[in-house]
Amino acid sequence: MSTVLFWFRNDLRLHDQPALRAALTSGATHLLPVVCLPAPDERTPWGFARVGAHRRAFTSAALRGLQRQMSALGNPLLICQAPPATALPQLAQAVGATTVVCEDIAAPYEQAEVAALRAAGLQVRTVWQSSLLPPARMPWPVDQLPGVFTSFRQKVERAGITPATPMLMPTQLLPPPDVPATVLQAVGAEQGAASIQLPAPPQGSDTRSSFPYGTPGCDGSEAAALAHLAQYLARKLPHSYKDTRNGLTGLHYSSKFSPWLATGALSPRQIDADLKAFERDHGANDGTYWLWFELLWRDYF
């Protein structure tokens, strides 16, 4: 028996999950899927809350959805109320694991989290998957990124760089290992996470809100994200995107993909693939191009 830990970060989904695929095909016989919640009172070095109430509630909805999906596949998500540097080494030791697989994130705080795990003796395999286009396919070294977006876009278009085909959701997972109750208690977790108190979204919404995340259509889960993408395309809203995208209030002036992209409940490559299919079926115009343009803008910044 061998176990690999999969650490969910800003990738709270099962569709188009190269990092999860890497864990499932690592040769391990068992999989322990883990997410670590930041403490409610955690502060940045500048004294601000690291995660605000609205983001915490929206992310919690994503986690509830992920719980349901993974439980249906026979391997419930382990939600820990302890930082990764505390929780993951304890869990790894308890189940005899030496390797953690996770999403690669190019940010100092997140890189420091990975460094702490390696310093604790764990092997950490990181997989880049958050952008539309992989940095490795760019026609320049990472340290020679064009200084302005327009140059970046033009070079990408001239080079004909296209996103990878998004991966399908797994239809099965490796079985979970047994984790001693004492270890679960030490990392503030219960397998299946039924007793973890996740913040609830607000009930109802202000009619002026451009993203009322307390309503079913704006739920934080992967299922809601994919349903939103499907209805957005079914209503042919990409054709009018460029004309309406700079509105300030209401639900339908822009794509509203950003909140789900931020938590990773929606993959940019899935958006691109579905948008390309939409263009084949209904035609391309400035609006559909501008949606792709904005995904590329997200990559650059």
Residue ranges of model-derived segments:
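Trp/Phe/Arg-rich N-terminal binding region typifying the photolyase-homology
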Residues: M1-M169
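Glycine/tryptophan-enriched, flexible segments
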Residues: D143-F301
